[in-house]
Amino acid sequence: ARQHKGRAMNKIANHMPTAELQALDAAHHMHPFTDNSALAKKGARIMKSAKGVWLTDTEGHRIIDGMAGLWCVNIGYGRKELAAAAAAQMEELSYYNTFFQTSHIPAIALAAKIAEVAPGDLNHVFFAGSGSEANDTNIRMVRRYWDIKGQPEKRILIARTNGYHGSTMGGGSLGGMSGIHAHGGKIAGIVHIGEPNWWEQGGDMTPEDFGLLRARELETMILQLGVENVAAFIGEPVQGAGGVIIPPSTYWPEIQRIVDKYGILLIADEVITGFGRTGNWFGSETFGIKPHIMTIAKGLSSGYQPIGGSIVCDEVAEVMGSAGDFNHGYTYSGHPVAAAVALENIRILQEEHIVEHVRDVAHPYLWAKWQALTDHPLVGEAKLVGLMGSIALTPNKATRAKFASDTGTVGYRCRERCFANDLIMRHVGDRMIISPPLVITPDEIDILIARATKSLDECYAGLKADGMMKSA
């Protein structure tokens, strides 16, 4: 009877034992950004279900998700309304394309809703399946824009070292991450300037002076290349995958001044910062940026369906529409099911005042506790905007020194302690980062901070025991 009950429970749970799942995963599933041979030996942690800010794995551990999946589950997991929207749309119109002078109701309604919530004159949307695809769209769009205006030589896009704009050939080229460039190279016509990372690179300068210095690299690069050759500048309001690098207050106003002075297009990559993450609907509002094009994805559907897009200002859209076909698009541009889910997601964000919750409740509550982490012997800096934050790990707070070990060694150890303590935090080099679902409550923030502190304590004890609290 006990054996029968065990089999029945396993059937209800709807999965094989974890070890068997791990073996199947290792045999057939190639994971992104992963050493798959190392993972095969270790075995993946396998998630089974989720609700709100909580994940449950196949071993029954209840894990608080400090990263909202990959920065995307803004309204939290398990919202039945989004499942219902997907099911209803699948029954009514499961798929149709938006090529060949054809449209459908979900794409029309979503484009109009995005125009409603987007700032300024960002009133037009070109849909894609992801943020990476949307940034590939942006490369072609800005080059086509200048071509139509009779300046086809304006083809170069300027981006930033350690920026992230996806991992397609186009998006990966825009991003300034050497590890991505090493696997397949870059496409032509993209150059990079420095990032506004004061903690690691600011030396003895004030953050404000360093912000100006980094921003003015854009002007230097424009003049070096020739303004007649430069199409656009792209940047994330806050570098996400680069380590939640919140720029000094002087940085974005100076960038805006420079793009305005030289008349180049400004692309704000809001894949992470969009849809409430910074306490406003868009990070551009938080930092006073006025982009011509805005990249969106992730929080657009809270990750419930893959969808992205480029929100385009009136002037760029008018030019793009004045010269015949734009020979670009994707099978899943404006996919009706994804669009219906995104529309329902935005309804929930609006009607449940989730953006206001971030600004007025969650951020102020987390801010005080996040800053207090700088009292920990391992933490040199704690930064937070809205509900995305980072802490810098250092062996010497006074000098902001790096560890003698290879960059990322300490961060990885800390991340593993977080995982062991049922907290998902990510490490970027030796920075620990968070980006929890926007619906996180003060009580859940207390749990997140308690588990983060325990993990830092354990990491610090291990580093001391192994003689690793040494400066480079």
Predicted regions and their residues:
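Short, Lys/Arg-enriched N-terminal segments with co-localized hydrophobic residues
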Residues: 1-8
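Conserved N-terminal phosphate-binding loop of PLP-dependent enzymes in the Aspartate aminotransferase
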Residues: 10-472
